[in-house]
Amino acid sequence: MAREMVAPFHEAQAWVEPEPKARQSIVARGLSKWFGSEQVLDDVSFSIAEGESLVLLGPSGSGKSTTLRLIAGLETPDSGEISLRGRRIEHLRARQRNVGVIFQNYALFPRMTVAENIGFGLRIRKWKKKKRGEVVNRLLGLIGLQDQRDKFPSQISGGQQQRVAIARALAYEPELLLFDESFSALDPQTRTGLRREIRALLRKLGIPALFITHDQEEAMEMGDHIAILNRGRLEQLGTPDEVYNDPQTEFVATFLGAANVVEGCWREGFIALDCEQCLRAPRPMTSKIATDRIKMIFRPEDVTLGGPTGLVETPHHLGRGEVIDVSFTGATESLTIKLLPRGYTGQLPNLHCGAGSDKPCNLMIKAVRTKWEAKKLRLAPGSAVSVGLRSYKIL
């Protein structure tokens, strides 16, 4: 698909906000859903504050789309409650919920013009023609498509079709907007620009929104909060910063961005890794006993590298390593590092395993450096490095 230029949304002063309504969040409690003998949702709960956006993120089959269909009224939960601004809606039909849905394919009517598509819902609701025309004109101004009003969907770009779909959903003043992977069909440049503009528009209008996506970058950018689903269960719910920097499960750590996972055990204030290295625990772990197995998780950008004879400036020294692979990705450089046996690291501070060991260490870790860090210390496959960590988390 050829790249398209996306003009910014017009300022929203042309939009006349509806009369203030009860400022309550949408709340889902204990949602469960079965399809035959398969449970696709298991006790999922979340809420969205007024004017905020929640992103449901997860792999295929995690229950994202089923959750959206339950909120939209396209499916009925087997158990659980859904409230919108204090009103129970799980028993209501879709058209009774006052919820707008923007689908992946936009679902525009091909034989209706842009203006007719935007006003379709109002016509179905039997709004008078004059009032309907006023709303359509305001929305065309809001999305910057006044000069496209008489064109058909096939005559405008994908980004413009997305805007028409949003305007159509906004026409009848919904209390909630649902986006079902609505950006996936757009080229990367259009998708990035449109995401930012839609987020700004939603904030300006104060409309809560629920986004469904498997795109991690989209989730981080669009969501005030992110709910990560896996096999029908809610793994973690939090702000983008919380779920990325403080993952509560291995799945969250490895699904939302890249992560190194190293196994070991707990030893009275230290972490003994399976690769024969030891690190001081980052904080007291009173819930652990000496035989407990643990997993240490750290992001590639948490790894810091130094030359073979010096020490990296970090409180957590992981040891010596050998560069196995280097790839340049533009703004960053990605490396694969193989940790060397403990015999190479016996003199490093913060390592307390005693004498060296001949036991091989087959642990591979991923590291990411900025282009400026890469220029400061040139590395290639076969280079020896000292390896440290800026931070890590124990599960």
State each model region's role.
Residues 81, 87, 233:
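ATP-binding/catalytic-site motifs of ATP-hydrolyzing domains
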